[in-house]
Amino acid sequence: MHGNSLQYVKLSEHASGLIRGSAGAAGYDLAAAHPVVVPSFGRALVKTDLAVKMPPGLYGRVAPRSGLALKKFIDVGAGVVDPDYRGNLGVILFNFGCDPFRVKRGDRIAQLVLERYESPPILEVDSLDSTDRGDAGYGSTGVGNWHSALWEGFSSGDLKESFV
């Protein structure tokens, strides 16, 4: 009967329900159940006093709200809600702003986005197939050697005029 629904329980009278901002919203807004101050350049755990049960094959990703990121420099961290977790949903807020960020009870602080996942069997092997990329990581697929091109632009004077 409830198999494909996103189910939730309010763990206190301070919890808000899951709210979609619009009919086409990908996420469900999560609201703070208690007031919290996130210090400037600091972080805080904000409890929602909600427990959830995801439909089969889905997990929850706690994502930032774009307005908080743009206007208040607030971001969200460590945002995976495993489908078998039944505890109080907490949201880690990072404040990249110069002023403390005050969260009031009921403030929408993040959104819960449901995503499909797979859990294939795990197999330890002696080696992996080779690829053209190999073990090149961290920027290896970006635009060439950007720092050399930038330096050449500055040293030739081409870019200096853009910044004056």
From Swiss-Prot:
Binding residue positions for substrate: R65, S66, G67, G79, V80, V81, D82, G90, Y138, G139
The organism's place on the tree of life at top rank: Viruses
EC number: 3.6.1.23
Transmembrane parts of this sequence: none
Record protein name field: Putative deoxyuridine 5'-triphosphate nucleotidohydrolase
Top EC group: hydrolase
Catalytic activity: dUTP + H2O = dUMP + diphosphate + H(+)
ATP-binding recorded as keyword: no
Protein role: This enzyme is involved in nucleotide metabolism: it produces dUMP, the immediate precursor of thymidine nucleotides and it decreases the intracellular concentration of dUTP so that uracil cannot be incorporated into DNA.
Pfam families: dUTPase (PF00692)
GO biological process: dUMP biosynthetic process; dUTP catabolic process
Residue numbers bearing the N6-acetyllysine modification: K71
Cofactor(s) the protein requires to work: Mg(2+)
